[in-house]
Amino acid sequence: GVVDILKGAGKDLLAHLVGKISEKV
């Protein structure tokens, strides 16, 4: 459902942000 899609997108976004932060450190 829509909620599942949003949850999946949230995880992808979180992983993307964590990756960017890790690159800067």
Swiss-Prot record:
It comes from the Eukaryota. The keyword Secreted applies. GO terms for biological process: defense response to bacterium; symbiont-mediated hemolysis of host erythrocyte. Keywords: Amidation, Amphibian defense peptide, Antibiotic, Antimicrobial, Cytolysis, Hemolysis, Secreted. Expressed by the skin dorsal glands. It is found in: Secreted. Has hemolytic activity against human erythrocytes and antibacterial activity against the Gram-negative bacterium E.coli. This is Ocellatin-1. It comes from Leptodactylus ocellatus.
